[in-house]
């Protein structure tokens, strides 16, 4: 997954984005190899873990300067600047290097649309853009304020 997004980011010149959806349909879960969908909070737990692993691949596997592209010396990379990622979690395992060189953004622009308390916390921690709905301006303003406050709690500058 991380490699696909890195590849797309290269192909688009750094314009790829990811709308992170935890899913709610059993059919979607079966498409991911599960018998049934996870419970609501467990879906966010799995999403947190998935992002932790992909962040490590995007941001921690290849140091700046690892790609040399020295044709004369026939050296593409400096292997001492490429590191394996080891993630052994409850839902996912990763053991190896990121299989694509760093892309223009390294980490794509992240969108999220969670409306539950857990979903908004997830969005506040990770997303650069959040889909919101609200019947009135005051309702929407309150949601924006709550998410901005939560983002600050995660050390982010909304």
What spans do the regions from the language model cover?
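Short catalytic-loop micro-motif centered on adjacent basic/acidic residues
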Residues: 111, 131-132
């Amino acid at each position: 997954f991380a490699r696909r997004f890195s590849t797309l980011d290269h192909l688009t010149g750094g314009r790829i984005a990811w709308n992170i959806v935890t899913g709610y349909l059993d059919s979607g879960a079966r498409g991911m190899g599960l018998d049934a969908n996870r419970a609501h909070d467990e879906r966010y737990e799995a999403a947190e873990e998935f992002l932790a692993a992909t962040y490590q691949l995007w941001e921690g596997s290849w140091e700046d300067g690892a790609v040399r592209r020295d044709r004369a010396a026939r050296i593409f990379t400096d292997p001492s600047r490429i590191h394996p990622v080891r993630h052994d979690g409850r839902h996912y395992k990763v053991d190896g290097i990121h299989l694509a060189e760093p892309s223009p953004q390294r980490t794509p622009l992240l969108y999220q649309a969670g409306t539950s308390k857990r979903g908004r916390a997830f969005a506040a921690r990770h997303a650069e853009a959040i889909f919101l709905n609200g019947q009135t301006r005051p309702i929407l303003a309150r949601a924006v304020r709550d998410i901005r406050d939560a983002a600050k709690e995660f050390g982010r500058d909304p």
